[in-house]
Amino acid sequence: IYWYTATKQSDGSYAAQVNLKNHGYNYSTYNIHVYVTSSTQVKMVAGVTTTEVYPPAVNLKTELAADELTCNLTASNVKLSGGVQKVYFAVWSDNGGQDDLVWYEAQESGGVWKRNISIADHKTDGTYEVHLYAENSSGKRIFMGNTTFDVSSISVQKIQAKNVDAVNGSFDVVVSGFVSPSGVHTVQVPVWSKDDQSDIYWYTATRQSDGSYAAQVNIKNHGYNYGKYTIHTYVTAGNGVYKFTGSTSATINVPTTTMQVGIQA
């Protein structure tokens, strides 16, 4: 609370100028009470009112790079009573709540606050929340506005089990048709044959000349089990986004043998 003494105006009214510095530079709803002291020194309430004081609207923009590796954040018209000391962008993805929240300090140039962020700091696809905070001369961070941007998911068009070899106990997993603006960093292929996944083995696929990724599965990594194998694929994109991208299966049967019986006379 701060008590102001109003000054009489030429029209007979009284006026007082309120300054936010007297109230910790707080932006909020302000309560105003008017007290009048009579000529007999009696003080009484003459009226009450409220007014809302908030920062001016900011111009907050996001520009996601075509390869979705980075996103450029900018904010202009960032103004506070008492001046702006620092500006921060609080960024997180909707997927998983705020478990990937990062506070980025912006840099000012020509009245525009900027920060280029890496999607790899969050490793998530979907909608990203961007909240803007300005720090006043008292060190308090004040919310100024918010916006969003979207990072693409990852998908593949084909997951194939090829070259099933019962004799050598192996088959190839080929993953192709990647849809990922930031490219492909790694492709992992977990494979198992038992219902409880006790024989699961993770293979790292290798990039082929045609852009596909391939991994060779060998039953020696699965206790030499024969039968149906479940195959899943996980892709890490160039921007760190990690996604399950599909599944298939393959069957390795016990190799058949030929037995010859000869009867000697």
Where are these regions (language model features)?
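Aromatic sugar-binding surface patches on proteins
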Residues: Y2, Q9-L20, S109-S118, T124-G126, ...
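Exposed beta-strand face motif in extracellular beta-rich ectodomains
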Residues: N26-I32, G126-V130, N225-I231
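Beta-sandwich strand segments
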Residues: T40-V48, S138-N146, N239-S247
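Short beta-strand segments of immunoglobulin-like
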Residues: N59-A65, Q160-D165
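Structural beta-strand segments of beta-rich domains
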Residues: L69-T74, G169-V173
